[in-house]
Design a protein with these regions (language model features):
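Short, glycine/acidic-enriched loop or turn micro-motifs at the edges of active sites
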Residues: 10-12, 60, 98, 159
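Hydrophobic residues at beta-strand termini and immediately following loops
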Residues: 56-58, 179
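N-terminal phosphate/diphosphate-binding loop that engages ATP/GTP or pyrophosphate donors
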Residues: 2-55
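Flexible beta-alpha connector loops of hexameric P-loop NTPases
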Residues: 60-70, 125
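Short, charged beta->alpha transition segments
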Residues: 39-48, 78-82, 104-107
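Conserved catalytic-core segment of NTP-binding enzymes
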Residues: 74, 81-91, 96-181, 187
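C-terminal boundary of histidine-terminating zinc-finger modules
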Residues: 189-202
């Protein structure tokens, strides 16, 4: 299967784990640099591959110098110019932060750019508050005729307290997986190691 991972967070840190801590040149910064040089952006300038997974980062403005949500919208406009919809991937994973109150970050839901949303959250109140906002946004756009649904929830750093499990039950969504709050996972993540590989514990 052909899989594409797109980081849609202005921090541009989605793909760093995949590439051993290295940051990918973002679509927005590459586009600005190429435009200044009078050149066109090519797919090879912004799309990279490791272990069979293609990946890219949309990027965003520097801290305190613009609107992150607007940057995401601009990033997708550039993707469309590159022929994003004709690339023939079997799965496209969009990693968005949960601030769907911002129209830019809610773009994939609002414009039916994705089929399903997987909510990632932990057992703390702030995380579940954001998860609830995402579910509410999906429901809102479905009432307006949208087709995006919530596939379920992945519980991250699960400490066994059951708060996220209870939230999922109340929200009427299944728990797809629970990633334990384990020191080995934390250590591997901090070292930019891919955690889940065939034949390993995870």
């Amino acid at each position: 299967k052909r899989v594409l991972l797109i980081g849609c967070d202005p921090k541009s840190d989605t793909t760093s784990l995949l590439f051993g801590g290295k940051s990918c040149p973002t679509i927005i910064e590459t586009s600005s640099r190429k435009k200044a040089a009078g050149e066109e952006v090519a797919i090879g300038d912004v799309c990279f591959i490791r272990d069979g997974v293609f990946a890219m980062e949309l990027g965003g403005p520097e801290v305190g110098r613009g609107c992150g949500g607007r940057g995401i919208i601009h990033g997708f406009e550039l993707l469309e110019k590159l022929g994003f919809h004709d690339w023939g991937f079997d799965y496209v994973l969009l990693d968005f932060l949960g601030d769907v109150v911002c129209g830019g970050f809610g773009l994939p839901i609002a414009r039916d750019m994705c089929q399903k949303v997987i909510v990632v959250g932990s057992n703390d109140l702030q995380s579940l508050y954001v998860a609830n906002n995402v579910c509410s946004a999906v429901e809102y756009f479905r009432k307006l005729g949208g087709n995006v649904g919530v596939a379920g929830m992945v519980i991250n750093k699960d400490d066994g307290t059951g708060e996220a499990q209870a939230f999922a039950a109340n929200a009427g969504i299944p728990v797809l997986a629970a990633i334990p709050a384990h020191e080995d996972i934390r250590r591997k993540s901090a070292s930019y190691e891919i955690i889940g590989k065939p034949g390993t514990q995870w």
